[in-house]
Regions:
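Helix-to-beta-strand junctions that scaffold the AdoMet/dcAdoMet cofactor pocket
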Residues: 83-86
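C-terminal hydrophobic helical "lid"/dimerization subdomain
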Residues: 78, 121-177
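N-terminal Rossmann-like NAD(P) cofactor-binding module of classical short-chain dehydrogenase/reductase
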Residues: 65, 91
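Mid-domain Rossmann-like dinucleotide-binding core that forms the NAD(H)/NADP(H) cofactor-binding site
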Residues: 1-54
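Glycine-centered, small-residue-biased loops immediately flanking beta-strands
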Residues: 28, 88-89, 112
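Short glycine-/small-residue-rich Rossmann-like dinucleotide-binding loops
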Residues: 68-72, 95
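A short acidic, Gly/Pro-enriched loop at the edge of an enzyme's catalytic core
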Residues: 55-64
Length: 177
């Protein structure tokens, strides 16, 4: 069953995961859940986007992907468990610094599968997708926030400070010899 898949997280990991998911499963309804309307508006290739506190009544998903991480992981996972159909799968990709409580009663009641993934094979598949669909790079360029030429430690410090102060996007350091 792959009628509808939800991805929680409107940051960089959620965006990258959603781009790849769209190319791997173009016929599956892709729904993005997040907390920032501006970030959600960048998911132009998704079928639907929803703020996590404004989910339509009766919305269900077949499978879920967690890309939230941090303190918000628990709320995201709880929401996934509530919306997912029985025997669905939840993939945990976001990193939390702390242990995250999970409602095992509902996991068991619904017969859900939970797994985490950061395996090398996943990254090998990523390279294959780049080769098959070069237009993916166009979508990924949307998350490049800044490019900084680096020749010194001061330049590196500047790049890291720029990166910390951005809401979205990655800073690329171009190393000069």
């Amino acid at each position: 069953r792959r009628k509808a898949v939800g991805i929680w997280g409107d940051g960089n990991l959620g965006y990258i995961t959603a781009v790849f998911f769209r190319y791997m499963h173009p016929d599956t309804k892709l729904i993005i859940f997040g907390t920032n309307e501006d970030k959600l508006s960048s998911f132009t290739f998704a079928d639907e986007t929803h703020l996590v506190w404004e989910i339509p009544e009766g919305l269900t998903i077949d499978h879920a992907i967690e890309c939230v991480g941090g303190d918000a992981s628990q709320k995201a996972i709880d929401q996934m468990i509530d919306l997912i159909q029985p025997e669905g799968t939840i993939a945990l990709l976001g990193v939390s610094e702390y242990a995250v409580p999970i409602n095992t009663r509902m996991v068991l009641e619904k017969g859900l599968h939970l797994y985490g993934s950061s395996r090398r094979a996943d990254f090998e598949k990523t390279v294959e997708l780049y080769q098959e669909y070069p237009e993916i790079l166009g979508y990924l360029s949307n998350i490049v926030g800044a490019q900084v030429e680096v020749s010194s430690i001061a330049d590196m410090t500047k790049a890291f400070e720029m990166d910390i102060n951005k809401m979205m996007g990655k800073t690329i350091m171009i190393w000069n010899k």
